């Protein structure tokens, strides 16, 4: 009897096309589910006969209670090599092997620049106005050359951001808890003397940190209050790094110029969420990693993970 594998949250209905699953055909029956289930009981009904699950980032949390309702589950694969929505301890207790796939940094970096440029050039309101016969040239754009980009985090994506910023002729400041002046200089950036200084001096602040106990809530009321009234905040990292209530306040009161957001504490974003309504927010539905090359890598390596597991030699194990 073949093992049953389900790919969850295949929103674009491309998972089965992005990799060659035929190598598994003799031993595994693979199906993809495009619908997103918010009710755990309903989800468990759909998955209770599955031996293998392939999940996309944190779209569907793998909680202890859900794992307990999946008696057949043997292998859980996530895109990326980190997933805070998986209860690794509960998976281990149940003997579920958890594996990951590698993730490219180009796509989220490019999306960050798309948001930044969209805000600076007022692309969405200008386009909407044009299509609706609104005012011609409604807003005054912001020139990037000579402006300061503040990077909260200078890892792989942050470093790429710094290099692109220099091509625009921007000054780059960077800060994180362990960042040194030498490391910043390697990317052509200056080390900000403090976190507050980064927010005070930057025209654009872009967040590029992994969510952890240290980074959760790292951007709060004090940091947002220190920003220039003409400055923009961009977060394509993780929503919980920023104090949501504080961000909503400064946006509603227009104490900063605006925000570009690709990540939210609840995803999909509820229909009545304030971030859907604020005119000074440019928001996208967590599409930073949703790109052709990333998806090919995710699902190709998911096939590899399954094949290795079937051979008794799991690869890219988490936990």
Task: Briefly describe each language-model feature range.
Residues 45-48, 61-66, 178-274:
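Rossmann-like adenosine-cofactor binding region
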Residues 94-96, 100-148, 152, 163, ...:
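Phosphate-binding beta-alpha-beta segment of Rossmann-like dinucleotide-binding domains, i.e.
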Residues 10, 154-155:
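Glycine-rich Rossmann-fold phosphate-binding loop(s) that bind the pyrophosphate
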Residues 28, 96, 189-190, 280-282:
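Short, conserved active-site loop motifs that form the nucleotide-linked donor/cofactor pocket
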Residues 158-159:
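N-terminal Rossmann-fold NAD(P) dinucleotide-binding loop
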């Amino acid at each position: 009897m073949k093992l049953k594998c389900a790919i969850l949250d295949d929103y674009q209905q491309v998972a089965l096309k992005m990799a060659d699953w035929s190598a598994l055909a003799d031993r595994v029956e693979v199906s993809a589910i495009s619908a997103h289930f918010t009710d755990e009981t309903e989800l468990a009904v759909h998955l209770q006969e599955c031996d293998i699950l392939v999940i996309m980032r944190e779209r569907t949390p793998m909680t202890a209670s859900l794992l307990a309702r999946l008696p057949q589950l043997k292998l859980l694969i996530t895109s990326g090599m980190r997933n805070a929505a998986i209860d690794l301890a509960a998976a281990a207790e149940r003997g579920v092997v958890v594996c990951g796939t590698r993730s490219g940094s180009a796509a989220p970096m490019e999306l960050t620049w798309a948001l930044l440029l969209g805000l600076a050039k007022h692309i969405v309101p200008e386009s909407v106005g044009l299509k609706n016969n609104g005012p011609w040239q409604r807003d005054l754009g912001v020139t990037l050359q000579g402006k300061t980009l503040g990077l909260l985090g200078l890892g792989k994506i942050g470093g790429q951001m710094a290099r692109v910023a220099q091509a625009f002729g921007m000054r780059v400041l960077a800060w994180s808890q362990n960042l040194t002046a030498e490391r910043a200089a390697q990317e052509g950036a200056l080390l900000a003397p403090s976190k507050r200084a980064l927010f005070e001096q930057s025209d654009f602040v872009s967040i590029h940190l992994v969510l952890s106990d240290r980074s959760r809530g790292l951007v709060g009321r004090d940091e947002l209050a220190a920003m220039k009234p003409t400055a923009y905040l961009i977060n394509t990292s993780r929503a919980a790094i920023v104090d949501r209530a504080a961000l909503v306040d400064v946006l509603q009161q227009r104490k900063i110029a605006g925000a570009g957001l690709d990540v939210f504490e609840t995803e999909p974003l509820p229909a009545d969420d304030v971030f859907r309504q604020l005119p000074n927010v440019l928001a996208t539905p967590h599409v930073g990693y949703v790109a052709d090359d990333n998806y090919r890598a995710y699902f190709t390596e998911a096939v590899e993970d399954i094949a290795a597991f079937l051979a008794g030699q799991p690869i890219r194990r988490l936990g």
